[in-house]
Amino acid sequence: MNKYLTLADGTQWIGTAIGDCQLEAAGRIVFNTGMTGYQETLTDPSYLNQMIAFTYPLIGNYGIDPTVAQAPTIGAQAIIVHELATFNDHYTSRQSLASFLTIHHVAGIEGVDTRDLTIHIRQTGAQMAILSNHPITDFEAQLATFAPQVLTATPLPVATTTIRPRVAILNFGEKAAITAELQARGADVVVLPPTASLKAVAAYHPDGILLSNGPGDPTDYHTYLATIRQLAQRYPLAGICLGHQLIALAYGAQTYQLSFGHHGLNHPVQACADGRIIMTSQNHDYAVDPASIKGTPLIVTHTELNDGSIEGLRLPHQAVMSVQFHPEAHPGPQEAGQFFDDFLLTIQKEAVVNA
């Protein structure tokens, strides 16, 4: 059956329905330039309320491996591809991408020239879009019929080990790979809801706090900023992606929306201290405003080489550090994992100082 992709500016593409074929969807359209990693991308909670257009022309050729999912469900509202593979040729595959989309009730469209779509987004900026079963005649009226999705809050867990160091992750939409990277380095991890009070966090006796990635506009999380500052006074604090932006806001900086976001696996980032360049995985539509850093205690540690946007921050006299990119990758290059080593080393040093 036909599927219609309509952008807010009236531009339309017609293709064939995939996934949950009868389902219609709406969300902010973004493009992802990764040649691989579609499963990790689709299950990244940061893509909540977004429709992902994959620029690589063939998606789904190595199927679905349940061990690499970043969350139990698909975060994206819809998937847009040029061609969906009819085979899944990999020894780890347990099902096709087509069946994965159907089981998780995700709408999709194939037969779209996603590179043409990407050029259009780059020229006009990110915008809302609707994936429908019929042509759209009144975009705003149709858009009003869709309700945005919200993440389910994580309950308070039960700490079952005495392993040190213990890192408490405030889960704004955490990818599973973040926990895995910390555990691979010997840390115990407890994942807490972002609404956890200082008292609730303290009950787990953490040695450090990590603010996770997550979806949406960072200014929508303003109610957490005071708690973030209080946590930074008591524990070493790190932030990834949204967590990075929240640390910036908590210390007086501002954020802004990028024209079309960073969504891909090959973003070059340079460390300000030594000039070292790493390739990073990125997924964000907002960034910290460089002009707003002046007058705050924050110091820029990393920048993106394509557009000069801020990719890392720290506080010089507190154990606070953050990065805009995804050091855990999954998908993407593994060059940025040093961030976790640095954070755990900071925790170790703070433990010695406070002993």
Curated annotation (Swiss-Prot):
Species this protein is from: Lactiplantibacillus plantarum (strain ATCC BAA-793 / NCIMB 8826 / WCFS1) (Lactobacillus plantarum)
Residues annotated as catalytic: C241 (nucleophile), H326, E328
EC number: 6.3.5.5
Expression induction or repression: Repressed by arginine.
Keywords: Amino-acid biosynthesis, Arginine biosynthesis, ATP-binding, Glutamine amidotransferase, Ligase, Nucleotide-binding
Full protein name: Carbamoyl phosphate synthase arginine-specific small chain
Pathway note: Amino-acid biosynthesis; L-arginine biosynthesis; carbamoyl phosphate from bicarbonate: step 1/1
Amino acids binding L-glutamine: S46, G214, G216, L242, Q245, N283, Y286
CDD domains named among the record's database cross-references: GATase1_CPSase (cd01744)
Enzyme class: ligase
Quaternary structure and partners: Composed of two chains; the small (or glutamine) chain promotes the hydrolysis of glutamine to ammonia, which is used by the large (or ammonia) chain to synthesize carbamoyl phosphate. Tetramer of heterodimers (alpha,beta)4.
Stated family: Belongs to the CarA family.
Highest taxon in the source lineage: Bacteria
Chain ranges of the Glutamine amidotransferase type-1 domain: 166-353
Record-linked InterPro entries: Anth_synth/Amidotransfase, CarbamoylP_synth_ssu, CarbamoylP_synth_ssu_N, CarbP_synth_ssu_N_sf, Class_I_gatase-like, CPSase_GATase1, GATASE
Record-linked Gene3D superfamilies: 3.40.50.880, Carbamoyl-phosphate synthase small subunit, N-terminal domain (3.50.30.20)
Catalysed conversion reaction: hydrogencarbonate + L-glutamine + 2 ATP + H2O = carbamoyl phosphate + L-glutamate + 2 ADP + phosphate + 2 H(+)
One of the record's GO molecular function terms: glutaminase activity
GO biological process terms, semicolon-separated: 'de novo' pyrimidine nucleobase biosynthetic process; 'de novo' UMP biosynthetic process; glutamine metabolic process; L-arginine biosynthetic process
Positions of the UniProt region annotated as CPSase: 1-162
Function in brief: Small subunit of the glutamine-dependent carbamoyl phosphate synthetase (CPSase). CPSase catalyzes the formation of carbamoyl phosphate from the ammonia moiety of glutamine, carbonate, and phosphate donated by ATP, constituting the first step of the biosynthetic pathway leading to arginine and/or urea. The small subunit (glutamine amidotransferase) binds and cleaves glutamine to supply the large subunit with the substrate ammonia.
